[in-house]
Amino acid sequence: MEKTRLQALLRGSEADAFVRAAARFALGEMKTALPAMERLLRPHDDAKWTVVTYLSFLWRPEDHIFLKPEVTKDFASRVQHPLEHQYDAELRLDVYESLLDLAKQIRHNFADLQPCDMIDIQSVIWVVGDYRDGREEPQE
């Protein structure tokens, strides 16, 4: 996680507001919580998908997924999902909703393997999105 700058936020006066916004996001109030998190993160140069999606993914892995941009865009491209073209580094709800749609499709396509939650779905994205011909070790 974007630890160095995020520590300043989490140890500062707006820590509670950020955690509350992250909790609202995790509970499904994404339309209001996403802009609230962005407003709190922007002064720390941390208004990034990795930061915004991390806590909800940990707190509610049955509903939320972690957005690691490069590997996720690569995966979306490989499976020709609209997220390939919809992705934007700006924190827009339609981007996250597209990611959730991609996750839903993965869950459906892997139903016979009985994925437990989005942690399993994230693993599929990571392994496939990180795959490169001829490379034996995963990229860090």
Roles of regions detected by a PLM:
Residues 1-4, 12-36, 68-140:
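C-terminal accessory module of base-excision DNA glycosylases/AP lyases that mediates lesion recognition
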Residues 36-42, 46-75:
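Catalytic DNA-binding helix-loop module of base-excision-repair DNA glycosylases/AP lyases
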